[in-house]
């Protein structure tokens, strides 16, 4: 039990540039399109936008009507040559690839499900995507522009699964709490998914019952309680939702194709059921192995007769998941076991019978990518001709491990979100008469559903939430319960002192922190007692930020301290040397960065005292680093009374502090007049 007493006042794990998104040839696409039918144009195009594109993308009204009738003649698909197939399935681009805008195969099941039950199943899809009420949409967009949300608090679970949610809807009046979904029986699923969903997902636990209405109701979700234990369930649930959305969209296009084919020439029928480009789902993942796990989830929820390029995919993306011993933390093994390369992007195309991997982006329904890999794809080629039009019609983003993305370069994530749902620079064979009005009006960022899963929430993730998760359907932020904090569960019996320094501004916080460290922490280290047989001072200085690490390291160059340093950029030989010299007492100090610990989880020996230059965002890092001291006590290298932990913090680290000291104490730490707080 811990008691508080107031005493006084960017690494990137890189590989050679990927080319998956451009490696598929038109002939490969033709092979999997043998049962597809194009979403044909209606008679009226969206004239205003068409003027912004080259005239090569426009066609005469007469030609468009004739094309609609000709393309719907019954032609045996197996007799279609590649050239004919290209003319049916899309307009060839300048690079020779074929772009098939929302061209989906004829699906008998679409007709089979066209009854009252199917209409009931599509209510959420209909309301949010297919046919939103224009007046309500305008009202909610106005509320979002004014940043006015009606909020309500949600609580669920108990014990270690207890959590809290804040549901925000862009309306003036408070909404009734959403009805919890108890199982997949309560979800609006396409019939093709029901059986597998019942077998693989089944009933929801208490936490899932709280977040499922937001997921399947097309609201944004920031889930800040992802764990190794619930990761697989969250993956299955989000993949089920993504598949359901693709099937809903495909069947809607097929039905409207049939209506257009049956309509007389003198009837100006209009069915707006598409976006500018085909890709609808974007999975932002941390490693290639995570991509394999998502694909496995998709294929167990939807059975495909054929999976094209599966062996090629597994050869490139999958590795055995047993390269670390059991003594490594579970979250570390989950993230880095298997293929941990983090520069990749790959398109996936779904037809009724086939899942095709390595489809070109413009022919894909789903894009799997890391933030780094996707940014590289956008920036490849001529800097003046960056291509991000394939992201213009993304309707669902699922970011699976945002906390791990933070440990890479978060700017890549910001870059990707800045390039979502922009008006395309080129037509890419788009039929504007089929494009939904809210796409044309530039409202897609507020219709897109964004699901972010993270082990915890940080200021950067909060910024993403506030800036890019502004859905007209609403948004839910869910966090784990930190009432007691991590410190309640620690049993090392070591004195842990939290010291607050004055930091007037968030912008000047790094300067204030360094000043406090130089004027208070370093002098206190020089006063530590030195004994002959102690094996050195054994002071580990944990520095979350690499920039702060460089600053501290440079300040020690001309000092009297003997020190070693380990960062994410330190090579293996120098790491071994630094650890050995620190353990043997040759170096009194060891500078250790947060990202070095994230990527390697070193078990460092010889640690007798710890100074946290800043509060770790990941509370597990605090536990593990304090545990270094605990192990030194067990080995009788230092007494419990001599061992110490000192944490430097400012009022700007409230979120990080809360996860460690608990919600019930964090207010005192950041607001009390005293600035030193001891925990035992």
Curated annotation (Swiss-Prot):
It comes from Pyrenophora tritici-repentis (strain Pt-1C-BFP) (Wheat tan spot fungus). The gene is utp25. Residues 18-39, 76-85, 105-117 have a biased composition (Acidic residues). GO terms for molecular function: rRNA binding; U3 snoRNA binding. One of its GO terms (biological process) is maturation of SSU-rRNA from tricistronic rRNA transcript (SSU-rRNA, 5.8S rRNA, LSU-rRNA). GO terms for cellular component: nucleolus; small-subunit processome. Pfam families: Utp25_C, UTP25_NTPase-like. This is U3 small nucleolar RNA-associated protein 25. Gene3D superfamilies: P-loop containing nucleotide triphosphate hydrolases. Component of the ribosomal small subunit (SSU) processome composed of at least 40 protein subunits and snoRNA U3. It is found in: Nucleus, Nucleolus.
